[in-house]
UniProtKB/Swiss-Prot annotation:
InterPro entries: ArnD, Glyco_hydro/deAcase_b/a-brl, NODB_dom. Catalyzes the deformylation of 4-deoxy-4-formamido-L-arabinose-phosphoundecaprenol to 4-amino-4-deoxy-L-arabinose-phosphoundecaprenol. The modified arabinose is attached to lipid A and is required for resistance to polymyxin and cationic antimicrobial peptides. Belongs to the polysaccharide deacetylase family. ArnD deformylase subfamily. This is Probable 4-deoxy-4-formamido-L-arabinose-phosphoundecaprenol deformylase ArnD. Signal peptide: none annotated. The keyword Ion transport does not apply. Keywords: Antibiotic resistance, Hydrolase, Lipid A biosynthesis, Lipid biosynthesis, Lipid metabolism, Lipopolysaccharide biosynthesis. HAMAP family: ArnD. GO terms for biological process: 4-amino-4-deoxy-alpha-L-arabinopyranosyl undecaprenyl phosphate biosynthetic process; lipid A biosynthetic process; lipopolysaccharide biosynthetic process; response to antibiotic.
């Protein structure tokens, strides 16, 4: 069997309300445990509309047919009216996920806020924003959260430093291959990072493959040994939990037939994380994704 980390990002109110229950049913049917990362504060995702002025973001939205893929309620959330509080209204679904023995971690307090502003926030603001999310999710789950995954992979040396204050078991904040410990400002290795090395649906559909070709494309990637193990695959509750739910169900069935076993990210950690190699988490770019994002780099 080939173990592949399965990360599920839940960005929005609709993704939590509609996508998570269906994903829980699908994963239970296939006897799979995964890592869910929840946005718990206001759903302001519609405020990304201003980014349509940027050619790369506009192209991405057009080629992925975003209006039908995500729905107008997601694309307009938090624009003409205050964003709904995801955690306050839908916290029970986060508890359901935890009770089903999936790994549950923090994605963001305000997904839009993190993705749009991380690059200019100072360390105190980064800590405050993370604290808002951690406190809310702790209260929802009635236990302490021990892992996180940065919204939109917006992470750099400063966010890495800021997250050290929370004692997470691991973070999944960047793209790249192979687990590592990012170097902090004082040269010490920090909390383990579990990078994502496989592309997401919206990064390749419309440029490399069609929607109908996506499963075959992804299965080929999953079955190809990574340059540095392990494979880590990210899906979104707003996509694979709603519009592409049947296609994702089929992908899981075929993956199992090919000897692929999806596992929570935390199970990829070695018994002694201190033995992981050191690395750097830096800003970079990725085909199919607009703007900068965190990337693994060698020391």
């Amino acid at each position: 069997m080939i173990d592949v980390g399965l990360r599920i990002d839940v960005d929005t109110f609709r993704g939590t309300r509609d996508g998570v229950p269906r994903l829980l049913q699908t994963l239970d049917r296939h006897q799979i445990k995964a890592s869910f990362f929840f946005s718990v504060g206001p759903d302001n995702m519609g405020r990304h509309l201003w980014r349509l002025l940027k050619p790369r973001f506009l192209l991405k939205m057009l080629r992925s047919n975003a209006a039908s893929l995500y729905g107008l309620d997601i694309l307009l959330a938090g624009t003409a009216w205050p964003g709904k509080s995801i955690g306050k209204q839908l916290g029970s679904l986060m508890r359901d996920t935890d009770s089903a023995r999936h790994e549950v971690g923090l994605h963001a307090w305000d997904h839009h806020g993190w993705q749009a502003n991380t690059g200019r926030w100072d360390e105190a603001t980064l800590i405050h924003q993370t604290r808002l999310g951690v406190d809310a999710l702790n209260q929802i789950l009635r236990r302490e959260v021990d892992c996180s995954a940065a919204a939109g992979w917006r992470a750099d040396p400063l966010t890495t430093q800021a997250k050290e204050a929370f004692g997470f078991r691991y973070n999944s904040d960047c793209r790249g291959s192979g687990l590592f410990r990012p170097l902090l400002q004082d040269g010490r290795p920090g909390t383990p990072q579990i990078p994502v090395n496989l592309p997401t649906f919206d990064e390749v559909v419309g440029t490399e493959v069609t929607t109908a070709q996506f499963n075959a494309f992804m299965l080929d990637r999953l079955c190809t040994p990574p340059q540095v193990a392990p494979h880590v695959y990210t899906i979104h509750a707003e996509v694979e939990g709603i519009v592409m739910a049947d296609q994702f169900d089929a992908l899981l069935a075929e993956a199992s037939a090919r000897g692929i076993r999806f596992v929570p990210l935390g199970s990829l950690l070695p018994p002694d994380p201190a033995q992981l190699d050191a690395g750097r988490l830096v800003r970079g770019t990725l085909p199919g994704r607009e703007g900068w994002l965190g990337c693994k780099a060698d020391v």
